[in-house]
Regions:
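Short, basic/aromatic beta-hairpin or loop at an interaction surface
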Residues: 47-54
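Short structured motifs
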Residues: 57-63, 75-76, 88-89
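HotDog/MaoC-like acyl-thioester-processing domains
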Residues: 3-5, 38, 68-69, 80-136
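Short, surface-exposed acidic-centric catalytic microdomains
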Residues: 39-43
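Catalytic strand-loop segment that frames the active site of acyl-thioester-processing enzymes
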Residues: 1-36
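Generic structural detector for well-ordered beta-strands
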Residues: 6-9, 60-62, 107
Length: 136
């Protein structure tokens, strides 16, 4: 089930064109993914303690509309795909008027402490990580 994470645009995130710099969206997406994982009950600290990590392997961002100072942004995060070693999140950033500022698909992989791809441990396959299409 999608989760919506809210944040407000801060002045230091603006570029010389007076809108959010494109690189800042990566920070927004990262923050929202970590909040998403917390909300769905994914124990990220436990995953690390057990010797695993989730690495971002690819990000595809489509910029649609400029976010500006003090805009209240809603970042919708959902799990799009889940395999044995990896998955993909879908993220949509909207302003308070509902206009889409950016859309992203973020692919990630599970690795062990040596950085080698690893199967996602069963205890971390919480319901929110499983895409809605796979639950049917």
């Amino acid at each position: 089930m999608p989760q919506v994470i809210e944040l407000e645009v801060r002045s230091y995130e603006l570029d010389s064109y007076n809108h959010v710099n494109n690189a800042v969206y990566l920070n927004y997406l990262e923050y929202a993914r970590m909040e998403f994982l917390k909300r769905i009950g994914f124990d990220y600290k436990g995953l690390i303690a057990d010797g695993y990590m989730l690495y971002v392997t690819h990000i595809d961002i489509r910029y649609k509309y400029s976010a500006r100072l003090h805009d209240k942004l809603n970042i919708e995060v959902s799990s799009l795909k889940l395999g044995k070693l990896s998955g993909t999140f879908r993220q949509i950033i909207k302003n308070s008027d509902g206009l889409i500022c950016a859309e992203a698909e973020v692919s990630w992989g599970c690795v062990d402490t040596t950085g080698k791809p690893s199967k996602i441990p069963e205890q971390y396959l919480v319901p929110g990580l499983i895409p809605e299409t796979e639950k049917q």
